[in-house]
């Protein structure tokens, strides 16, 4: 059993903003460009807002121009679940956090080829950023090694 578990619906409603709840629990999409992490390129990790599980690392984040944080890959592909999404008259691949089943965003195959060709377009409202300097203090010491040689 993972140490990162989704909270109850009541706890999520109490601790998340309405936007965070709607994005993660109801698969809504936050507005582009004016969200919290679109322009954040500080060193650190991005964790699931509902469970605290590390999902993305700042060294895999890139400027995509899409209006949402974009990553070339997750920290570990086993932390992410992909689902076919046919909503809004489009066919896309929805990205969810595997342990918490929280909606994160979508993945597209139009990312930079030198980074693997994928673009994980993720809602800021589904994430919490942990600055590198605070990772150990906040319980993410096991992920500091990911920044070596980067």
UniProtKB/Swiss-Prot annotation:
GO MF term (any one): peptide-methionine (R)-S-oxide reductase activity
Keywords, sorted A to Z: Oxidoreductase
Catalysed reactions, as listed in the record: L-methionyl-[protein] + [thioredoxin]-disulfide + H2O = L-methionyl-(R)-S-oxide-[protein] + [thioredoxin]-dithiol
GO biological process, any: protein repair
Superkingdom of origin: Bacteria
EC number: 1.8.4.12
Active-site positions on this chain: 121 (nucleophile)
Domain MsrB: 9-132
Name of the molecule in the record: Peptide methionine sulfoxide reductase MsrB
Gene behind this protein: msrB
